Amino acid sequence: MKKTFINREELEAIVAEFPTPFHLYDEKGIREKARAVNQAFSWNQGFKEYFAVKATPTPAILKILQEEGCGVDCSSYVELLMSHKLDFPGSEIMFSSNNTPDKEYAYACELGATINLDAFEDIEHLERAAGIPEIISCRYNPGGVFELGTDIMDNPGEAKFGMTKDQLFEAFAILKEKGAKTFGIHSFLASNTVTHLYYPELARQLFELAVEIKEKLGIWLDFINLSGGIGVNYRPDQEPNDIALISEGVRKVYEEVLTPAGLGQVKIFTELGRFMLAPHGALVTRVTHKKKTYRTYLGVDASAVNLMRPAMYGAYHHITNMTHPEGPAEVVDVVGSLCENNDKFAVNRELPHTEIGDLLVIHDTGAHGFSMGYQYNAKLRSAEILCTEEGKARQIRRAERPEDYFATLYGFDFDKDE
């Protein structure tokens, strides 16, 4: 059974003030997670966590992480702009993008962000847009499949991201010739891994590559970015990742590979998003309909526009009935109101007997939840509420209104007949 970070009485008080559906975040949990990550990697003097903004692009959340010493990993102009408006200095902004417009390279350079080049061909784009900066990173894709033991974790060879090894070496040589002085590498090989072995294996590949870069190019890397990929236990029967154990595995490989090669000062960076935020957010929704045909359907006031992952990936998110957490079980589909049959949060899920009006919590939506929202069927995006460390509920993003939906349209008078 998954635990919620809020009890029934607390949730009912919040719902009395803010109508469902909404995304709810736990400030205490977010701060504790950031501190745990920083403590786990404290053995590395230059360690920095650059939170993946794409996971939860909400200023109030980014400010919490900033206060805990995190930087930001941006992938677009607006994410860069948001980070700048929140007073993240360029040294705390990593710009990891792909198929990047020239204006975004120019803006990233203007801010002093570290650019992580996705493609060998991007050298030309970057030079044309802003010149070659002194600090530069390149993204590596080893190709093939990524395995841990006998398990295939992912297939980098089919990913659109990164450079081949030959391209990487040529890129570093060219960038050095064009004036770059400080170098780093980055790689992302698997998503949402629930194992303490992923980071150490990725680290080994990148550390050995760093040694080879030093020997063949005479370039001492300043940092190695392990990016993201550490996942969360969406299912209650999964063991959560232990970041201290994961970091210890990385440290052992660091001392085995980098230190003997004279690279014992290399900084370790991470770009965790899901691991940092997912467990500390939930989608709160109310049951509005109950329908029985060939199955039993619980209709809720949230839909895939509020949480796309189950519809898009078939992803599992645990669901807790906060109103009636116990009782005789029934097998149900939990569904939204979109005109799409994949608008389902759960399929053939066993839940306690549920009635219209019950409050449901959909777990682990703190990352890639609100951020993946959209407006199909002219649905409006929901509010975001923060449970503060003081036990208060604070709205950090209001729900969209109809006038927001029409705000960008020309030739349409929203106020007509009023």
Where does each model-flagged region fall?
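Glycine-rich, aromatic-flanked loop segments that form ligand/cofactor-binding clefts
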Residues: 131-145
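Active-site loop/helix belt of alpha/beta enzymes
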Residues: 142-288, 351
